[in-house]
Amino acid sequence: LHASNAAVIDGGTITVKSSVEALEGTNVTINGGTLDLYATDDGINAASTATGAEIFIKITGGDIKVEVGQGDTDALDSNGDIIMTGGNLAITSTVSAFDFDGKASYTGGTITVNGQTRTEITADGPGGGGAPGGQGGGPGGH
């Protein structure tokens, strides 16, 4: 699913069984719904070449499963920020759960990566970014 600017999911059921990038836009907001995404590259991708573009992935609700293939892949890849305030995010990835160039904020919801609970969002893949002080967003702003 590709949006040239904002991709906003407010509800419903979305299943992507095979894709290169399952859900992408300049910014991606998931407020609710059930998403089951599989990608051979990035599961959810926020990127833009436009100067000054507001680039982010924001999850406020929903039940989201993201599985990515092997290689240089990221479950969530943002050229800006990753923000999570609610919802349930279950990631299956052999390489990288999160890759971001901005900051990470995790104040609510649940995150599991390969069945293990995460208490913060950290860039963990090859070339994993995160601006200085941007890594380690955890519940309660930690």
Question: Where do the language-model regions lie?
Answer:
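A composition-driven surface/loop motif
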Residues: 1-142
